[in-house]
From Swiss-Prot:
It comes from Arabidopsis thaliana. Belongs to the MAM33 family. It is found in: Mitochondrion matrix. This is Uncharacterized protein At2g39790, mitochondrial. The keyword Transit peptide applies.
Amino acid sequence: MAFAWCVRRSASKLASACGQARSISAVVNRPSLALNPSPLSPFVSRGFLYTMAVDKLSSEQTLHLVIDSELNSALQTDDPNLNEEMAPGSFPLKIRDKPGDQSVTLTAYYNDERIHVDVGMPYLGDDVIDVFGPNNDELSFPLVVTVIKKNGVSIEFTCQAYADYIDLTDLTVHDYQYQMGETDWPRFKNLDDNLKKAFHRYLATRLDANITKLLHKYMVSKIKREYLLWLKNVNKFVDG
């Protein structure tokens, strides 16, 4: 069962919960239940409380089974070679990734430039791609690459990162030395095509195709890790 299933089912779960609430309300307000009231409640019979207890036990057992299935599915699809590929010395950028955070920060140096990369989690809408399936290469991640010169001037690239390329969508120039602040005009889409190509090449020199591919694999793996963390927290709740 896939992660996407959980995302898509939120609306139906809400409708189901509302239906259960109406059913319980109908049972509680039946006149026959008032003939033999429970000492615990003037409105609910002992039989009703027993049925509710059995239903609760059954639902918890079912939830445990589903969570175990999801955990096994996520663990079986993890990439065993990823840690080696992303290890210092193999991957040129230093990664800062805290469990539970929805973004990853990477830093590196290129000649006299300091490169700072922020990668966010993708938006998982109704048509989300199954991250446990074979088509997760189609996922894209929001990416902001900041290149900082020694003189303090920097340029910030706003992008979408795919498995095999980076789509540059906008850029901003910062020059605090002369109190220019931010300059985000003209918009990237309005630039001359040759200038656009030059910026794409400039960015690709600092984040080449191999880095892009590994970064995409790492972020897909992070989605799975965060999902596993969420499942384990749900398990703790059920066990409590």
